[in-house]
Each structure stands twice: as structure tokens, then as C-alpha cells.
């Protein structure tokens, strides 16, 4: 595994898996599954706050886990299986000599994948870029359910995607259409100003 980042780098806060996804983990690698389930926060309810009402829907089955904890679990499992892991190693091209002799190359280099661009004629990707803006935050306020909170402002709607991922932390993603983001002047706001605006909304 060649990873462009350092071993314990992470971006964002927590990630979410459905019960169905966890079931796939259990089939593919029971050891990783057991470690993940020892470290996650599970819930069945989804709370939606819209126009002053709270609507709760149950039986969904999701779990949240910290991104860094998940990376640590997967790195430890790979090491236990004898997988060579090279960190701070950028692979810019599948013709990189470090990949010579590989039976399979999996390039997980994000939405702007250079490998996908290189082989676009073969893969025929269908990429649909949208214009929503979001801010991925974390808070120590704990929520009992996966929460969607919609708030209307003078220029349009904001929504928050909220989920607890450990005993003390919740992911709090704030999203809005780009037109609303621009109308509120958030394109000129720094991080602190953006967070203060979200707190006020």
C-alpha cells in the first residue's frame, strides 16, 4: 500500500456505515469487523428537524466511528497480514516503477483521480459536479440519533448532517447551495467567521 499521507493523518471527523455495510465487512474480514464494532457508536433512529417539527424514523441501523480510529484499525490489520505499507509516498502514474510486477492496481486517489482521467476512455466515468458548499465540523454536543436539521435563512436553506462517532464527539456537517453561500458572503469568510455564522444559524 502506497499512501500519500502520514500514518495517522486524517481529514474530517467521523464516518458512517450502515448495518448492511458492516455485514459486508464481517464476511470479508471478521477480524477487522470485530475491532470496528468494538469502537463504534450504533443507532437505529433518524431525527429530522424541519420547519419547527421533529420527525423520528426508526429501524435504520447505522454506526459512526472516528476516521483516525478506523484508519488505525485498518493499518494494524494490514500489518498483521504482512502488507507492506509505505507512507508519504505519492503515486502519480500507474507506470510508476514501484508498481512493476503488480497483479492488480487499485487507485483510490479521490474525486480528481489522475488515474481515472488517464483511462477515462476505458472507464467512461460519469462525473456530475454539483454546486453545494459544506463545512465539516465536530462538536462535543452528543446526539442520540442520526440527525438532519434544516434551517431557513433570509437567502435560503441550510442543512446539517449530525452523527455521534465516539463517547465524546459528534460530526456536524453544514451544507447549503452555492447560491445561498454566496448570498451570505461566506465566500469572503475565514474559518472562524464561517463557524460563527453556522452557530448563529
Show which residues each predicted segment covers.
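Glycine-rich FAD pyrophosphate-binding loop
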Residues: 1-12
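Conserved N-terminal helical subregion
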Residues: 19-136
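Adenylate-forming
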Residues: 135-137, 172-173
Amino acid at each position: 500500500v502506497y499512501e500519500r499521507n502520514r500514518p495517522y493523518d486524517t481529514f474530517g471527523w467521523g464516518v458512517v456505515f450502515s448495518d448492511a455495510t458492516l455485514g459486508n465487512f464481517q464476511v470479508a474480514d471478521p477480524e477487522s469487523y470485530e475491532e470496528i464494532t468494538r469502537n463504534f457508536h450504533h443507532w437505529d433512529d433518524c431525527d429530522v428537524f424541519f420547519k419547527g417539527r421533529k420527525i423520528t424514523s426508526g429501524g435504520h441501523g447505522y454506526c459512526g466511528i472516528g476516521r483516525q480510529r478506523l484508519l488505525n484499525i485498518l493499518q494494524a490489520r494490514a500489518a498483521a497480514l504482512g502488507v507492506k505499507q509505505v507512507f508519504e509516498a505519492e503515486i502519480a502514474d500507474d507506470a510508476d516503477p514501484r508498481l512493476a510486477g503488480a497483479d492488480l492496481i487499485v487507485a483510490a486517489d479521490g474525486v480528481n483521480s489522475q488515474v481515472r482521467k488517464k483511462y477515462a476512455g476505458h472507464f467512461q466515468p460519469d462525473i456530475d459536479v454539483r454546486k453545494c458548499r459544506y463545512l465539516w465540523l465536530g462538536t462535543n454536543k452528543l446526539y442520540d440519533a442520526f440527525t438532519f436539521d434544516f434551517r431557513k435563512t433570509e437567502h435560503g436553506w441550510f442543512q446539517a448532517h449530525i452523527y455521534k462517532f465516539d463517547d465524546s464527539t459528534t460530526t456536524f456537517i453544514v451544507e447549503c447551495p452555492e447560491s445561498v453561500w454566496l448570498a451570505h458572503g461566506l465566500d469572503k469568510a475565514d474559518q472562524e467567521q464561517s463557524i460563527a455564522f453556522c452557530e448563529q444559524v
